[in-house]
Amino acid sequence: MASKSDKQVTVEVNNNGRSRSKSRARSQSRGRGRSVKITVNSNNKGRRQNGRNKYQSNQRVRKIVNKQLRKQGVTGPKPAICQTATATLGTIGSNTTGATEIEACILLNPVLVKDATGSTQFGPVQALGAQYSMWKLKYLNVRLTSMVGASAVDGTVVRISLNPTSTPSSTSWSGLGARKHLDVTVGKNAVFKLKPSDLGGPRDGWWLTNTNDNASDTLGPSIEIHTLGQTMSSYQNTQFTGGLFLVGLSSAWCFTGYAANPNLVNLVKSTDKSVDVTFEGSAGTPLIMNVPEHSHFARMAVEHSSLSTTLSRAGGESSSDTVWQVLNTAVSAAELVTPPPFNWLVKGGWWFVKLIAGRARTGARRFYVYPSYQDALSNKPALCTGGVSTYTRQSNPVRTTLQFTQMNQPSLGRGATPATLGRSIPEPGDQFKVIMTVGALVQPNRSDTQNWLFKTVTPPTGHDAARVGWNTQHYLTIQGFLLIDSLEWLTPNLQESQEPPLIPELGVYIGIHKKALVYFMQQYVNPHTNNKHQVSSIFLIKPTENFSVTNYMSYFFRESQSDQNVANLKIRPQTWQQTVNFQRGKWYLVTNTAIRNGPPPSGWVWDNIELTNESIYYADQVLAHFINPPPQNSKIYFEVHTTMPQSRARSIGLEEDQTDNWQEPDEDLQTSTEESDYETDSLEDESDDEDSNTCRELVINTLVNQGISRERATYIGMSAYPNVEWGSGEQSTSQHIQEISSDDVGAGAHYSCVCERKQQSLNQGSRGHAE
């Protein structure tokens, strides 16, 4: 207490857990607690103090008291290091329903404060959190920076509130007002300020850093941001769907107690913007969340979760030791049907999950749902008291947006192979796994009829067929076509990847004009009969300009046999002349299917054969998607190549009647009959083969000296001199080298040019020896 007469300040701190009798002997009370009494004489014996001296006196008293409290150990350990940082955590979206919607839930543990798109990237706060065992906050400022003008939108108010326990709860807008909160008007910047008294931990103000420890000691408080009222555009009088605020944290994190846990910096935080979610459960069983196994969240959970050998408390199935926080920020949160009694948990917008070992028969990944982080650590899933009624059961999953955060890492030390930070960029030639989202139907296709395909390789008079290939003798006529809305590129080990470069050797041609680029190719060869094989090819193309294709079209149908219980898949004999429009910048999946006679082919097959009426086709990996139009927004998965399989380039030749040149041959490349006869005879002479080898080596060495890679130069040389000599009527080797050196087009164009000239020469000579 403070005495007014002598200006003495007395501070008494008693940290004994219980009261003690005054009659108890002093020896019996030792070690049971300590009472700290500090008396400070702040009286100035001189003249009366002015305002400045009073402030200095108060500062002196405060320093003395703090020093004595630290000596007695009642204020916790001294900070070893403090880090001031500003973190930008994402955006606050608009309200789409008019009800209370959660937009963000920010956990303040330093290893969890990450951007929702940051993956495993980390900053100085996360790095320090992985090196020290305890943390606390000196202060915290939550800054909302407006992304729209005050007059641009209306109808919505934003509320920032402090959740001191970081536990999901069923809270209404009025309940949020009972917390410490700040209401923000859209269009104005705001700062939500918190003091140390709002952020103190259970250990003299400190929190534990390791998230594997008790939840009440590690998570710290959390910041929740909600919106109320539908967001409308003032200018258009329509619903506004953009972002309202940019969220940032400004704070000073203090750390003490060095204890390195390197893997804490690798905790993942990301967003899955389109995922189908369902919940299941019955009386007495755990609540389970299902997501597709190809979704971004499922892949990340499988990659970063470590499965334990212990069994679940109620389900009997093994679950992971890794806990994930899931935040549903989409409008569909209220549409998710959940078994009782945890409807409030899902509609509240965020919960915790752990991956269940194995996958469901439907191909989905399953997760146990937990109402709190402590329950997840203790492996106590939410138990249902009943199932979903028939009237409310969903026929289709709800598509929503999930923000997910990896909460813990069972193994905290650094393994033999450190985790790779950031996103890897694929090298050319890699194989990829691609998940494609189907777009709208391309006319003349309709949802209630079979898929139209280009049937013939010979178009109507005055029109050209669309061909995809790499030169005049190696191409396929486009048959099937499908609009693709979006693509997700994955590496062979299911890591996210950037879009690979185009395949420079390939293109889509209408006549002699290149209309589209090719980004991947894949071919499937399936045995048809003992001496036949069905070859189906797919290509992903992107038009560089708008173009139309007019050709004879038909569709597949099931033909029933009277003596058999099977229905054969055949192409309709009747054809209709139709026009299909391809739009610039859109993705299209195009296909070609052919029945090949003979032994099993090796390498890539360029058989430009039309769909025949008598042939029976199989619904293979490609045709299964082109018999009937797939639903819009459905997913299609393929494993593809993003470069030409170079070892297969000339493995399969075409018959004369299957070849259709895109360009007229140059007059300089025409050879006389005598020259062709001479070339045919020379193929039987071994000395001429040696000359051909010499010319080939000359071309290769010249290209290498001019900067082209050895592999590419060899590829061009082998194609220009396939063990035959050029006719005397062709251009000389030096002329070809000069053209390759001076031309501005790429190596793929040079290669095609050389191959076309050589092939035209061979066609005029002895074609049988060319191959």
Curated annotation (Swiss-Prot):
Residues 71-263 are annotated as: Inner core. It comes from the Viruses. Residues 654-692 have a biased composition (Acidic residues). GO terms for biological process: clathrin-dependent endocytosis of virus by host cell. Residues 394-423 are annotated as: Core attachment. One of its GO terms (cellular component) is T=3 icosahedral viral capsid. It holds the Pfam family Astro_capsid_N. The keyword Lipid metabolism does not apply. Disulfide bonds: none annotated. The keyword Glycosyltransferase does not apply. Residues 1-70 are annotated as: Basic. Residues 19-35 have a biased composition (Basic residues). Keywords: Capsid protein, Clathrin-mediated endocytosis of virus by host, T=3 icosahedral capsid protein, Viral penetration into host cytoplasm, Virion, Virus endocytosis by host, Virus entry into host cell. InterPro entries: Astro_capsid_N, Astro_capsid_p, Viral_coat. Residues 649-771 are annotated as: Acidic. The record marks 313-314, 393-394, 423-424, 657-658 as: Cleavage. Residues 424-648 are annotated as: P2 globular domain. Residues 1-59, 653-694 are annotated as: Disordered. Belongs to the astroviridae capsid polyprotein family. This is Capsid polyprotein VP90.
